[in-house]
Amino acid sequence: MDNKSAYGHLAKWFEYLNDDCGYEQWSQYVIDTLKSYPVSIGLDVGCGGGWFTRAFVKEGYQMTGLDISAQMLDYAQEQSFKSGLRAEYILGDISKIKLPKRYHFATAINDCVNYIPKSKLKAAFKNVAAALQKGGVFLFDISSRRKFTQKIANTVSADDREDITYLCFNTVEGDEVTMDVTLFEKQADGSFIRKDERHVQYIYDEEEIVQALENAGFTLVKVEGHLGEDKTLADRIFFVAQKA
């Protein structure tokens, strides 16, 4: 499924509804990893609303954010302007877009890779590699099979706040995860408007990821669980690879 329409309604609410995700610690973990490499120009693939893009800019990196959702990029640009943490933003699909070979590093954080259909993963990684200079570093994560099958499958998640109510109905069939999102947005007159959208993610095992990386010309540097935890028990797996 093409996820271009995902986040059409959720874009302006996403960071607000995920304000308890530990973004500060998460971004610092990635930045600390980056400090091991002599890099300054980065590409944030699947940047969404730009939270991590802005965190990298704040740290002194020159950033470009890429996303398939126009609504998410609108939000990212708005927040970039408000914060003074300026970045370039590009609308595009990483499995199709051809970018200039100018970046020292690329990131893909918070399920970006899970949104890529299995038939497009190799093309996506090859396009990341093509955008990196020799020796460029690729840092990204995936939500793990354990998370999807043991914690997400056949569940409903909800968040009820004064101005927005969020419901997400999750189903897993094979390696495909469907998330049907319903939002109830409060209006100025006190009424609510319902909005619906569908997200589809894909479950990847470490072996699939490593094979796609090697096929794209990367060498695997590190694989570990979120924030360095045991990957066999982690809900999120973090990868570091380097372009040969």
Model features per residue range: what roles?
Residues W51-K96:
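Class I SAM-dependent methyltransferase SAM/SAH-binding core
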Residues I109-D111:
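Residues lining the SAM
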Residues M1-Y37, V39-G48:
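Conserved class I S-adenosyl-L-methionine
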Residues S119, L139-E208:
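SAM-dependent methyltransferase
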Residues E206-A244:
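C-terminal lobe and adjacent flexible extensions of AdoMet/dcAdoMet transferase-like proteins
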